[in-house]
């Protein structure tokens, strides 16, 4: 949903410690370099220390987001509980329930940097993963990629053609990251 305006302790969120130096990329920008991601991670008041340990860490989040950005980006990822998720969805979308991910896209800066906040509601993400028979790690990866695409102007709610384009991108990006098709 788009609104305009340390070390891993959980093996499901394990990652390769390499920095990817020397890797070829299909996502190089016009200057012949990979897009850069400036990433901050925040936790809402409802997210306690125990839950933080089970969430994907900053490095893993960056690894998931990097193939989903097509120009330099500055993202804040915020993990929230049901109360904050519901309040944000109500305030900005006039819907009185918490949703899985909200993207607050602030547009592109004059220097071409895409700026956005991605807000993930942990209880909703966890419930959906269980109900859909997905691993939690795969569902978080999917929703982060989904939110990043929204931040760059993709919108599945504009029509079937736009939805198909966005889903195809998500499937391709997630496959490159080693995740299954989230729509099966």
UniProtKB/Swiss-Prot annotation:
Entry-linked InterPro entries: MetalPrtase_cat_dom_sf_prd, YbeY, YbeY_CS
PROSITE patterns: UPF0054
GO molecular function, one term: zinc ion binding
Co-factor binding comment: Binds 1 zinc ion.
Subcellular location: Cytoplasm
SUPFAM superfamilies: Metalloproteases ('zincins'), catalytic domain
GO biological process terms on file: rRNA processing
EC number: 3.1.-.-
Protein task: Single strand-specific metallo-endoribonuclease involved in late-stage 70S ribosome quality control and in maturation of the 3' terminus of the 16S rRNA.
Family: Belongs to the endoribonuclease YbeY family.
Name recorded for this polypeptide: Endoribonuclease YbeY
Lineage: Bacteria, Pseudomonadati, Pseudomonadota, Betaproteobacteria, Burkholderiales
Name of the gene encoding the protein in the UniProt record: ybeY
């Amino acid at each position: 949903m788009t609104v305009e305006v340390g070390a891993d302790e959980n093996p499901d969120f394990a990652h390769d410690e390499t920095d990817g130096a020397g890797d070829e990329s299909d996502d190089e920008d016009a200057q012949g370099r990979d897009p850069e991601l400036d990433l901050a991670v925040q936790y809402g008041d409802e997210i306690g220390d125990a839950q933080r340990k089970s969430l994907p860490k900053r490095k893993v989040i960056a690894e998931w987001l990097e193939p989903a950005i097509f120009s330099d980006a500055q993202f804040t990822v915020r993990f929230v509980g049901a109360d904050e998720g519901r309040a944000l969805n109500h305030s900005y979308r006039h819907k009185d329930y918490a949703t899985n991910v909200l993207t607050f896209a602030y547009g592109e800066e004059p220097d071409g940097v895409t700026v956005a906040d991605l807000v993930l509601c942990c209880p909703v993400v966890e419930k959906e993963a269980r109900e859909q028979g997905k691993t939690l790690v795969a569902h978080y990866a999917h929703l982060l990629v989904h939110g990043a695409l929204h931040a760059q102007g993709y919108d599945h709610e504009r029509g079937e053609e736009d939805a198909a384009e966005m889903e195809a991108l998500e499937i391709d990006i997630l496959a490159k990251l080693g995740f299954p098709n989230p729509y099966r």
